[in-house]
Design a protein with these regions (language model features):
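Acidic di-acidic motifs
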Residues: 39-40, 95
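Conserved beta-strand elements of the Class I
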Residues: 35-37
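Short, basic/hydrophobic alpha-helical segments
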Residues: 74-88
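Phosphate/oxyanion-binding active-site loops and adjacent basic polyanion-contact surfaces
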Residues: 40-44, 68-76
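C-terminal accessory helical subdomains adjacent to catalytic cores in phosphodiester-
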Residues: 1-33, 45, 49-66, 84-93, ...
Length: 164
């Protein structure tokens, strides 16, 4: 006896039933739209633009980097303002340089409370970029880190590294 679903009842019980993906077609979850707001025009912005440039072309428009002329404590407010204007960017981030930030814990708390992800750089942001060259040296002083990274960058790329 055949059932209304087109197969014998024994077929469904024997594990021959189509799973949900087969019945509905393959559904691939959509990658979210990210908004990264930073207060530095140089290093952090360049890092994220390089990251965006390395992803497939069809995904590049899902990662927006905005540099805001704002104090670090105002970045959460700026991120929320931009999300309000461009609602497709549902995953807001603030990224800032950890050096000399007053109220660090409060900034993180405010971001979390408002649904904004927070990221901050090592006192020498260039330490992150060392990872692209397969290294992660232990350098304590920011100025030493920058100088050593500039040397490494020039050796690998043949170009001078400038930090303003």
């Amino acid at each position: 006896m055949a059932s209304k679903s087109g197969g014998k009842p024994s077929d469904r019980r024997a594990g021959k039933r189509k799973d949900r993906n087969q019945r509905m077609g393959q559904r691939v979850p959509e990658l979210g739209y990210y908004l990264i707001v930073t207060d530095t025009e140089e290093t952090e912005k360049n890092y994220f633009e390089g990251l965006r440039d390395s992803i497939p072309a069809e995904l590049k428009d899902r990662l927006i980097i905005k540099v805001e002329k704002a104090r670090t404590v105002e970045l959460v407010e700026k991120a929320l303002e931009l999300v309000g204007k461009e609602s497709q960017y549902r995953i807001p981030w603030i990224v800032f340089d950890r050096d000399q930030v007053k109220g660090f814990d409060e900034i993180i708390w405010t971001a979390e409370k408002n649904g904004v992800h927070a990221g901050w750089s090592n006192p020498c942001f260039e330490i992150w970029m060392y990872a692209y060259f397969g290294e992660m040296p232990a350098i304590r002083e920011s100025y030493t880190c920058c100088d050593r990274f500039a040397d490494k960058f020039e050796k690998v790329t043949g170009q001078k590294y400038f930090k303003e």
